[in-house]
Amino acid sequence: KWNIDLLYNTHYEQNRQTTDTYSHHTLKNNIYDICQHNDIDRKGITHYVRTGAEYKFNDNAHINLAYTGVFNPNNDNHSYSDGNITTADNRTKKEARMHNIALDYLSGFGMKAGINYTPYHSESHQQFTYKDNKNQTSEFHTTSGQTIDRWKIYVDQSHTLPREWTLNYGTSLTYASDHNTQFYHTQNGTDMSELNTDNRYNEYTYDFYVGFSKNMGERLSFSASITGEYYKTARYHAWAAYPTAELTYVMTPAHILQLAFTSDKTYPSYWDLSESTGYISGYEEVQGNPMLKPSTDYSANLNYILKNKYIFSLAYDYQPDLFQQLAYQSTERLALIYKTLNWDYQQSFSATTIIPFKIGHWLDSHVTLQAEYRQAKCNKFFDLSFNHSKWIGLAMLQNNIILSTKPDIRMELTGLYLSPSIQGSYDLNHIWAIHTGIRWNFANQKASIQVKANDLFNSMEGNIDVTLRNKGQYMDMHTNNYSRNITLSFTYKFGGYKEKQHKPIDTSRFK
């Protein structure tokens, strides 16, 4: 039996952001007060297409071939910076395309196998003009590109054993080849060729895992697995193990305990691993870091579920080698450098309570309260270090409201508040947000019209204050990002159609 599906959608996005930066910059025992105002406009269109063909041998075995394409034909980015030491005009045009071909097979005896190939290419052109406080003008043009070829092959096997045991094991091999280039072309005679970069990067990741699960009667269930990984690049290679375990104990139907431990790894983007330098303004720049390492995330969670409704959780999260991009005021020149570096670690302890409640048949609500202690430590941040910690609070109320049953009109209303928090050496202000939406279901629940408004008051990303005070580093930044968005959608289901869920293609490491 054959099944064939085809999906196409397109997405246009326009974003506006303003940033005000006040930098109290210490350089060679002198202090420079630098003020910069940046206006940034971004717009672009994305086309997404997917087609797949599946052949079912029987109910338990099938083979599937799928193609996915994502195309960004024209993304424009224009930023204008005005300050007391420099003004700059920065225009960038970018286009990108990604293809993915995946072949997957599921046997009738629990084996899964597959291979997929992902080629990706992007190129951008930047026109940069800046004028210093002496009215001297400089111009340059950059061309940059990224070409990635990624292959993955995997085999998984699952066995159902006697006495309610389940055994799983498998292996996978991923190879990625990345080619990053950036070339500077000056337009006023200044030689900038020392900033040109042409980097090739090969990455090998080999994984193998084994796991099992067991139901011990009606009250106790347990599962565990361990993944071994060998990761290799030209500058870094290491073996690592990632265990997971989960235990569920049903004391009574009204009292359930869950204990879980997980571990995973996060890889830096391929562009961050390049040696490139990009300019935001005449004062701000972004540098790559070819010495970046993957980070690991270890998490432990204890949940107590009361009456199948109320949830009380304790969690601990430890992330060695966590990498994030932070700003640094150079001690060698007047430059604010943004660079992604590995920290020693970030860790957090948190306690969470989720309380649902209903009022009649028209209101179904959930209250979430969380208290978190977060610590970020880095002993080698350029020529500095930081050890930053803070208590953080989160409160969220989610409401599902039935406005009418005939006609069927429902409303969603969510509000959240996050207290002042930290990011590395930064202090961040509090944020809050309101999300809402209304849905009308009709035609015997086959059709619906929905209007949604996210961040209704533009308060979540529209009013961010960043404060840096660390061993002579002194900076204040205010960012206003237009994050409010309103969507209108119409859905009609033909017959018994159910939308298929497809595993998304991982593009998180692409530029």
Please provide the spans of the model-predicted regions:
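Transmembrane beta-strands of outer-membrane beta-barrel pores
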Residues: T10-Q14, G69-P73, Y117-E123, L173-H179, ...
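Outer-membrane beta-barrel translocator domains and adjoining extracellular loop/strand segments
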Residues: R16-Y32, V70, N75-R91, E123-K134, ...
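Extracellular loop and loop/strand-boundary signature of outer-membrane beta-barrel proteins
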Residues: I34-D39, N84-R91, Q136-T143, T190-D198, ...
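C-terminal beta-barrel architecture of Gram-negative outer-membrane proteins
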Residues: A395-F442, A447, N454-V466, N470-Y474
